[in-house]
Amino acid sequence: LKEVLRSENPDFLINAAGYTGKPNVDACEYDKTNCLLGNAILPGIIREVCEDRGLSWGHISSGCIFTSKGTDGTPFVEEDIPNFTFRTNNCSFYSGTKALGEEVLEGAEKCFIWRLRIPFDERNNPRNYLTKLLMYDKLLDVENSISHRFEFVDACLDCFAKEIPFGTYNITNPGSITAREITQIMKIRGKVHKEFKFFENEEEFMEKAAKTPRSNCNMSSEKLSNAGIQMREVHEAVDFACTNWVVEELV
């Protein structure tokens, strides 16, 4: 990395590397070494190299280090302490390593930490949350903050271009949405012709479909908005993705 930076001499570096597991975070439970290396150790190495050069940079983190809502029932803000981590002993291995990655970057100089949450967009892809909802036999109907992928990328780049203060930012589309609401939008836009089935509760989901706990949380993106970077309200963003879906019919 030092050699590349010396050769290319960039103005800004983005760390989009990480380990998420395929097809989902359950896979991280069986490859813990690489998960730890990619999500917790690598960010620390990049920090050291960037600070040695005085280089500004951004790290793509995750909102999956939180679960539920804040103590007062409101969405989590950047100053809240993550509650879905190894320290709280209730998380997936993936979430635990992403939380460690943020701990490694505590006090980092000239650094943005961007929290992504359940990425989606209008392109059919196995990593797209909308595609996953279409493919699963049964869904868990919970409320979440999510991020339109292209808007997320634009927001990250705007952080550097607009020279907003360094620090941590929740980069999610304002508001929250449930899986059931998303499937209803899909039907309204004529992109799906199936009847969706839902688990009765999280207990049934964990018993029948998951190997490790999932993060479901509401996050505030007000700090980002106050810095002058706007994203569409989440229902509007999902509607846009469904309206502009690139595959005529998936199901």
Language-model regions: role of each:
Residues 1-40:
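NAD(P)H-binding glycine-rich loop region in Rossmannoid oxidoreductase-like domains
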Residues 13-17, 57-63, 69, 114-116:
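SDR active-site strand-loop-helix element
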Residues 38, 144-147, 177, 219, ...:
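Residue-level signal for the nucleotide or nucleotide-sugar donor/cofactor binding architecture
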Residues 52-55:
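A short helix->loop->beta-strand "cap" motif at the edges of active sites that frequently abuts
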Residues 103-153, 158:
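NAD(P)-dependent short-chain dehydrogenase/reductase
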Residues 155-158, 162-209, 215, 246-251:
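Mid/C-terminal beta-alpha module of Rossmann-like enzyme folds, strongest
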Residues 232-251:
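Amphipathic terminal alpha-helices
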